[in-house]
Amino acid sequence: MADESETAVKPPAPPLPQMMEGNGNGHEHCSDCENEEDNSYNRGGLSPANDTGAKKKKKKQKKKKEKGSETDSAQDQPVKMNSLPAERIQEIQKAIELFSVGQGPAKTMEEASKRSYQFWDTQPVPKLGEVVNTHGPVEPDKDNIRQEPYTLPQGFTWDALDLGDRGVLKELYTLLNENYVEDDDNMFRFDYSPEFLLWALRPPGWLPQWHCGVRVVSSRKLVGFISAIPANIHIYDTEKKMVEINFLCVHKKLRSKRVAPVLIREITRRVHLEGIFQAVYTAGVVLPKPVGTCRYWHRSLNPRKLIEVKFSHLSRNMTMQRTMKLYRLPETPKTAGLRPMETKDIPVVHQLLTRYLKQFHLTPVMSQEEVEHWFYPQENIIDTFVVENANGEVTDFLSFYTLPSTIMNHPTHKSLKAAYSFYNVHTQTPLLDLMSDALVLAKMKGFDVFNALDLMENKTFLEKLKFGIGDGNLQYYLYNWKCPSMGAEKVGLVLQ
């Protein structure tokens, strides 16, 4: 953890879910459909971070005591209004809506234990308080799958997005850039580049029907999106074909139309049509039922800028000069033989990754083709560096992907460039040295902050390399699969 001599780093808020919905037909990167108004779906964390040496922020508001069970939205609250004047009815409706939105999604198990989950109670997932000791599907695979698309609200239509069309790709970029994940203080918003979206959405095995858009019939404007990508997942002793669902996004002006649940039902249906009935997804909120919980940590690379944009703040008794000195890094990496990954390295990187991941309980199982897709360097998307020894053997590698955030309402700075730790495999080079070099490389490439989850072996280097702990958790979930929960150190899966 950071000590009081360090800056307090605002951590990116963890990924919110994009969820599955509809009669067990679905897969996701989960969304909190229990709270339709809170329709932002986090991937990598946007909120500024805490650290132990700085005074923690006071919570914006104390929660109001709630009577009875909670409801999913204002629309679900029955209120007798027949005899009230129109103005009074409007006031009551606004109050109900504000109360519902103000509750927000549960960020902790304690908060979640006080909620009712009317949507998730209908899905093949374990209940929050359930103790799971078995392994296997919650319900059997379905034989009878709906053939027709789900019905959208009047005036909207489905459209499978052709991301090979630059114009369509730009439309998706614009939708996400203007309506996707923001931090709790509305200071930062993820800025997925068009090239990043192609990397994230078109891995080997991608299907065009899984790039599921919603358009306005009259104007053809893109106002909603959800996606699925295939993934082979190893969970304890079982390997399953699953999907990851991501980028659930609904235009801000349509969030009262209940479009998100229909998107989730529809992507679920389309995935089931391909014979896939399990999913893995992550969420920054607590839903039934996490299989693992991780925390984001953040390492300042450009502390002056991070402080100026209020991503971080000066810890007490610290000056800007002392802070910059604290986070200063070497000019160049120190590991001999460290170089960018090349095409010839793909087989050995695949081999190293496969062998390394065997020690964890939740991991991807990648083909050589998938390793090429996810790890071969692409500028401003993915960086991978290998360590080649004196005998010409590749013994280790490090990797991080690029996900900037737009800085909103700042007179000088417009973008925050963040690196996210991906997979780091060591056999000869100490992991601490490998990750120290990762920080140096990220700094050389102009990144402002380096983010990492405390999964796999990451806890062994986070404090030593002056990472500050974030202020939110990232939950991992499995859809239609029961298994015991695991500690963060046994999670070996990183989702973009």
From Swiss-Prot:
It catalyses: N-terminal glycyl-[protein] + tetradecanoyl-CoA = N-tetradecanoylglycyl-[protein] + CoA + H(+); N-terminal glycyl-L-lysyl-[protein] + tetradecanoyl-CoA = N-terminal glycyl-(N(6)-tetradecanoyl)-L-lysyl-[protein] + CoA + H(+). Heart, gut, kidney, liver and placenta. It is a peripheral membrane protein. Changing Y192A: Reduced glycine N-myristoyltransferase activity. It is an enzyme of class 2 (transferase). The keyword Acyltransferase applies. Gene3D superfamilies: 3.40.630.170. Pfam families: NMT (PF01233), NMT_C (PF02799). Residues 55-66 have a biased composition (Basic residues). Its EC number is 2.3.1.97, 2.3.1.-. The keyword Transmembrane does not apply. One of its GO terms (biological process) is in utero embryonic development. Its main location: cytoplasm. GO terms for molecular function: glycylpeptide N-tetradecanoyltransferase activity; myristoyltransferase activity; peptidyl-lysine N6-myristoyltransferase activity. The modification Phosphoserine is found at S31, S47, S83. Keywords: Acyltransferase, Cytoplasm, Membrane, Phosphoprotein, Transferase. One of its GO terms (cellular component) is plasma membrane. Adds a myristoyl group to the N-terminal glycine residue of certain cellular and viral proteins. Also able to mediate N-terminal lysine myristoylation of proteins: catalyzes myristoylation of ARF6 on both 'Gly-2' and 'Lys-3'. Lysine myristoylation is required to maintain ARF6 on membranes during the GTPase cycle. PANTHER family: GLYCYLPEPTIDE N-TETRADECANOYLTRANSFERASE 1 (PTHR11377:SF7), N-MYRISTOYL TRANSFERASE (PTHR11377). Belongs to the NMT family. This is Glycylpeptide N-tetradecanoyltransferase 1. It comes from Homo sapiens.
